[in-house]
Amino acid sequence: MVKLRLKRCGRKQRAAVYRIIAIDVRSRREGRDLRKVGFYDPIKNQTYLNVPAILYFLEKGAQPTGTVHDILKKAGVFTELHLNQ
C-alpha cells in the first residue's frame, strides 16, 4: 500500500522543511520514495504541490497521513479529485 506522507529535509537542529512524498507503507520515514509530489515549509507557511501527481496516486488508492490530508484539504485537492470522478 502506498501512502502520501512527509519526509524531513534540511540540516539537523534547524527549522524543519518537509517534502511530500509517495512511499510504500513498510518503508521508514527517510526511506526511498516512489515519487516526490510536493514541498511544505511550516515556518514560512509555503506549500508547493504537484497536483496531477497527487491526484494520480489518490486515484490509485494511496492514503494520505493526517498532516498531509490537512495540507491537501487546505489546498483544495480533494475537490479536484471529486470533479475528475
From Swiss-Prot:
<dbReference type="InterPro" id="IPR020592">
    <property type="entry name" value="Ribosomal_bS16_CS"/>
</dbReference>
<dbReference type="InterPro" id="IPR023803">
    <property type="entry name" value="Ribosomal_bS16_dom_sf"/>
</dbReference>
<dbReference type="GO" id="GO:0009507">
    <property type="term" value="C:chloroplast"/>
</dbReference>
<dbReference type="InterPro" id="IPR000307">
    <property type="entry name" value="Ribosomal_bS16"/>
</dbReference>
<keyword id="KW-0934">Plastid</keyword>
<dbReference type="GO" id="GO:0005840">
    <property type="term" value="C:ribosome"/>
</dbReference>
<protein>
    <recommendedName>
        <fullName>Small ribosomal subunit protein bS16c</fullName>
    </recommendedName>
</protein>
<dbReference type="GO" id="GO:0006412">
    <property type="term" value="P:translation"/>
</dbReference>
<keyword id="KW-0687">Ribonucleoprotein</keyword>
<dbReference type="GO" id="GO:0003735">
    <property type="term" value="F:structural constituent of ribosome"/>
</dbReference>
<keyword id="KW-0689">Ribosomal protein</keyword>
<keyword id="KW-0150">Chloroplast</keyword>
<comment type="similarity">
    <text>Belongs to the bacterial ribosomal protein bS16 family.</text>
</comment>
<dbReference type="Pfam" id="PF00886">
    <property type="entry name" value="Ribosomal_S16"/>
</dbReference>
<dbReference type="GO" id="GO:1990904">
    <property type="term" value="C:ribonucleoprotein complex"/>
</dbReference>
